[in-house]
Every structure is written in C-alpha cells, then in structure tokens.
Design a protein with these regions (language model features):
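Primarily recognizes the serine-hydrolase "nucleophile elbow" in alpha/beta-hydrolase
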Residues: 1-60, 66
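Active-site-adjacent alpha-helix of alpha/beta-hydrolase-fold enzymes
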Residues: 65-148
Length: 151
C-alpha cells in the first residue's frame, strides 16, 4: 500500500533477499522519476495496516517522502512481523509530506488491526502442526473479531 500511495522503494530493496526477480522493484523505486506520476488519482486516502518492509530496508527517507496521500497507519506495539518502532512507526514518521495518523494497539502483535475471520476449521487442534491454526489469525491482547450472535 505504501508504494501505491507514492512511497518509492529503496534502491536496496531491488536486490534484497526476498525481492522479486529481474530487478522488478526498480520500476517503483524513489529514484525512478515516473514513480510520483504512477499514483492513482482516484485514491483520496488510505489505511495502512501493519505495513511491512521498513525493518528490512525496503523503504528509506527519500522513498517515504513521496507519500502525499492522507494515510492512517495501524499497528500493534508488539508486532514481531512488521515491527513497530523500526517498522510501522518509522514509516509513519518518514511519510513527512502526507497528512498522517498512527493508531497503535498497545501490546498487540501483527494481526490486531486486521479482523479477518478465521476459518472454522482452524479452531480445532492440528496434530500435524502441533498447535491451533487459529493462532495464525489471533492476537493474544486485542480480539478484533465481531461478537458471536448465535445465542
């Protein structure tokens, strides 16, 4: 999402571990003069839920300065995936040219802001996984699922 609203990827991201092959990200880097022109004008505002990449060098100051779309960043302060201080909060701070807000779920992990209903099958213990698959969707501190209405 950060790239879609004007944030250009860093040069380091083009060849980083996990980057797409053939330098595909080079078309969306901050150094590419066409990046600013590729922001869809229909997007008037955005919500970035736990955006990933800052902690791995996919974003830098130059790239984040390209964000000009108003954006609400949502993150958990205990996010172990996107990170908080060095991840989402750093992206928020770096988007200096955008009207922006940061909503922090205190002590929440990566999934707190994403109320994705878990498939019913994930509530059963998996012998193969030696855990409950639901834990992939759950947050121990913030339960963002809608309350059950079945009785």
């Amino acid at each position: 999402l950060v790239n879609v609203i004007g944030g250009g990827y860093s040069e380091a991201s083009v060849t980083a571990n996990g980057a797409p092959p053939n330098r595909l990200l080079s078309h969306r880097t901050a150094s590419n003069p066409d990046v600013a022109g590729k922001v869809d004008p229909r997007i008037k505002a955005a919500i970035a839920i736990a955006p990933w990449g800052m902690q791995n060098g996919f974003w830098d100051a130059a790239g984040l300065a390209g964000v000009r779309t108003p954006v609400l960043f949502v993150a958990g302060s205990a996010d172990v995936v996107a990170q908080y201080e060095t991840g989402t909060k750093a992206i928020y701070k770096g988007a200096v040219n955008a009207e922006r807000w940061l909503l922090t779920f205190v002590n929440a992990n990566h999934n707190a802001g994403a109320p994705i209903p878990a498939p019913i099958e994930t509530y059963r213990y998996s012998e193969r996984m030696k855990s409950y698959p639901f834990l992939h969707y759950a947050d121990a501190v913030w339960d963002s699922r809608a309350p059950r209405r079945d009785g």
